[in-house]
C-alpha cells in the first residue's frame, strides 16, 4: 500500500522527533552534489564552527554555474566568478572531496554528470544546493534542492531535518505524438496545475507515456517538477532505469550489481498505493508547448495565441498577465507562430543531454539559421556529452547550420557567466525558467523543447515542429 | 542563529503573485562567497533604473521612483506583505539573506514556495501564511494608512494590527522552538550522532554499493 515516496522516505528516517507522522524527522542523505554558487558560505561556516564533513565519499563537486562556455585555456576572466570557482576547489582539496575541474572531460552541469557517472542510483536520497536536484528523481531517488544552511547541515551531519511532503500522482497515459517530447509533457502539466500546483508535494510521474520515455526524457520531466512547485519529482524503476545505469563509473559491479538490481526493482509504488492528489493527462492531447510569459505556467500550444488579459476575471491573475505581456513586449491575440526571435539557446540541466542534441541536430541538418537570428548556441550538458556528440558528428551539423558549439555549463539558462540576453532580446530556450531577467536583464525567454528551439532557429520564428519539413 | 523576539514594525506591501528568487536577488550577486551585504541588491532590477553589478556603490545608483519599496513611507519596514507563491524558483538562500539584510524580519503571504519557506527558518526570518482575504486587507491597509504597522508574536502565533484585530498563524512546533531560542540546528542533529552512525552501519551492510 506504499507509494514510492513512502518507501524512499521511510528507508531514510534516522530518528523521528515525535509520533506525529507529519512531524520533523532526521533524514539520512546518501548523495550530496555540490557546486560553486551555494556552497562557499556553507564550507566557511562549517569551518568556523570547528566541524568537518561527515562523509566525504558521499560528495561529488563540480563548478557549472560560473564557467565560461568559450575557450577555457586562459581560465575565467571575471575575477569574482574566478574566486568562487577557486573557493570550491580549495574546499574540495582541504577535505579530499571528489571534484571534476573545468579541464576534466567529466565536468558539466551537476544534474547531468551525477546520473552520467552513475553517482545517482535508485533508492538514494540526493540533495544539492540547487532547486533542479529534482532531476535525479528520474532514477527513483528522493532528490530535492536545499539552501546553503542545509548544505552545511548535510556536510556536518550527513542528515537533514525534514518533514514529509504530501504525494501527488501525475499520470500520463496514451501515445505521445511525433515531435512531442518530455519537455512538452512537463510544460503541459505546469500549464494544467500551475507553478504552485505541486507546492508541499512530492510528485510521482507514471503512466505508459512516461514509461515510454528514455532516461534523458525522464530527467527532463523530473527536472521541471520544481517549476510545478514540487521539491521532488520521481519515477519508479524499470528496465530503462537499470539499463541506463549499468557499467557507469560509480555503479556497482558483479555480485553487488545483482544484489542492487534486486532491491531497485522494488522501488515503485504499490498497485493500491494512495496519493493525496491525482492529476491525469492524455498523451494524445499534448502538443508542442511554448511559454509566452514570465512564469512557466504562462504557456500555450504552438497553434495557440498570446492571451488577452481582458478575458481574465480574477484581478490578481489579470494583473500578472498584463505585467508579463508588457515585459515580454507581446500583444494579446498574437499567434505564437508569429513571434520572431533573436537568439536560440539549446542547453541547461533540463535539455542538454545527448538525446536532446540529437533531436535538435535532426531538425537543423542541412539547413541554415534564419537571418534574423543573431546567435544560436548549443551548450552540451557535460564534456562527455560533448565528446559523444562530436563522435556522432552533431557538432558539424550544428556549426554548418550557423550554431555556435560551446563548452559545457549552465550558461544562458541563468546567465551567470558571459552568455546572456541583452535588454529586449527574445530567445527560444530549452531551459526551465522564463522569469524576468533570468537570461539577462530585460531579456525575454520562451521555453520550448530542443526540437522546437531548433525549428525556430531555422524559421526565425516559432513553428510547429510536427509539420516542419525535414 | 539569532533569536526571534516579539516584533512590531512598518509594513511594506508588494502586491504581486509568484515573485521568484531571481527577482528577489538577481544572479550576478550570487557570485559572492560571503553571506552578508545582499540587502542593497534586494529586488535589484525593480528597485533601480540602472543595471546592478557586484561592487557597484548603491549610493551612486538611480532609484526607480515607481517601485513601492522606494517610497519614503516604507523606509525602515520590517514586515513585507505579498501574494501567493512568494520565493518560487531557485533554491538560493541568498534570497532570504537579502530580505533579512535589507531589514525585513517577517514575510506574510497566502503561500510560499517550499524551498524558500524552509530556507527562511534556517536564518531566523519568519514566513507567515495568512489566508488570501486577510492578506488583501493587510495590503490595502499598508497602501492606504501612512505608517501602517503590525505586531508579530511568535510565541502566541499571532499577527496583530494596532486596531486590535488579531490573526492566528500556523508554524511547525520544532521550527518555532528553534526560532524562539535561536538554536543551532546542526548542533541539535549532532546530539543524535550515535543514531546516525548506527543507521549508517546498517545501510552499509544492506546496500554496500552506496558506499563505493
Swiss-Prot record, chain B:
Catalyzes the isomerization between 2-isopropylmalate and 3-isopropylmalate, via the formation of 2-isopropylmaleate. This is 3-isopropylmalate dehydratase small subunit. Heterodimer of LeuC and LeuD. Belongs to the LeuD family. LeuD type 1 subfamily. Pathway: Amino-acid biosynthesis; L-leucine biosynthesis; L-leucine from 3-methyl-2-oxobutanoate: step 2/4. CDD domains: IPMI_Swivel (cd01577). It is an enzyme of class 4 (lyase). PANTHER family: 3-ISOPROPYLMALATE DEHYDRATASE SMALL SUBUNIT, 3-ISOPROPYLMALATE DEHYDRATASE SMALL SUBUNIT 2-RELATED-RELATED. The gene is leuD. GO terms for cellular component: 3-isopropylmalate dehydratase complex. It comes from the Bacteria.
